[in-house]
Amino acid sequence: MKTFVLGGGCFWCLDAVYQKTKGVTSVISGYTGGHDRHPDYYSVCSGTTGHAEVVAVSFEEDVIPAEVILDMFFALHDPTTLNRQGYDVGTQYRSSMFYETTEEKILFEEAIERNQALWAHPIVTEVSRLPVFHVAEDFHQDYYAKHPEQGYCQVIINPKLAKARKYYSAWLNA
């Protein structure tokens, strides 16, 4: 079992896709990368905590390779925009990868190099050591599964799910 902590904009988006991915056993929305010891959604959204919205994606490598998890990450958000994803603007929405081991750091750096060719502009994804992972409030866990009709889900998340189905259908559950 391996766990990657990834930030690619609003955590609801990555959560929605990874929840449907074969071999993924857990997706937990949370916050990391900042200085506030007790972050919550409102403090993180204020931009004063330094934290990013992230997901901790746990997966079985014998079912899905780490490289596929990371390539999906780069396909599902724009890693070339600093501190924003579409209409979501602020440091909490930065493209980020948080590692616990040197092996993970190397995997992340290789994924950036591998995926750079897909983008016209330089990838600005932050690669940092994971300080502390703070689990987000219950309201944010499995958000898409609980609220698929909500406007944000319809306008922002559904196109990401469609993209995942188009390019990664072999890795998604039916």
From Swiss-Prot:
Reaction(s) the record says it catalyses: L-methionyl-[protein] + [thioredoxin]-disulfide + H2O = L-methionyl-(S)-S-oxide-[protein] + [thioredoxin]-dithiol; [thioredoxin]-disulfide + L-methionine + H2O = L-methionine (S)-S-oxide + [thioredoxin]-dithiol
Active site: C10
Signal peptide range in chain numbering: none
InterPro entries on file: Met_Sox_Rdtase_MsrA_dom, Met_Sox_Rdtase_MsrA_sf
Domain of life: Bacteria
Broad class of enzyme this protein falls into: oxidoreductase
Keyword Nuclease applies: no
Gene3D superfamilies membership: Peptide methionine sulphoxide reductase MsrA
Pfam name, any one: PMSR
SUPFAM superfamilies the UniProt entry points to: Peptide methionine sulfoxide reductase
Keywords recorded for this protein, A-Z: Oxidoreductase
Any single GO BP term: protein modification process
GO molecular function, one term: peptide-methionine (S)-S-oxide reductase activity
EC number: 1.8.4.11
Described purpose of this protein according to its UniProt entry: Has an important function as a repair enzyme for proteins that have been inactivated by oxidation. Catalyzes the reversible oxidation-reduction of methionine sulfoxide in proteins to methionine.
Family: Belongs to the MsrA Met sulfoxide reductase family.
Protein name: Peptide methionine sulfoxide reductase MsrA
Organism: Arthrobacter sp. (strain FB24)
Taxon lineage: Bacteria, Bacillati, Actinomycetota, Actinomycetes, Micrococcales
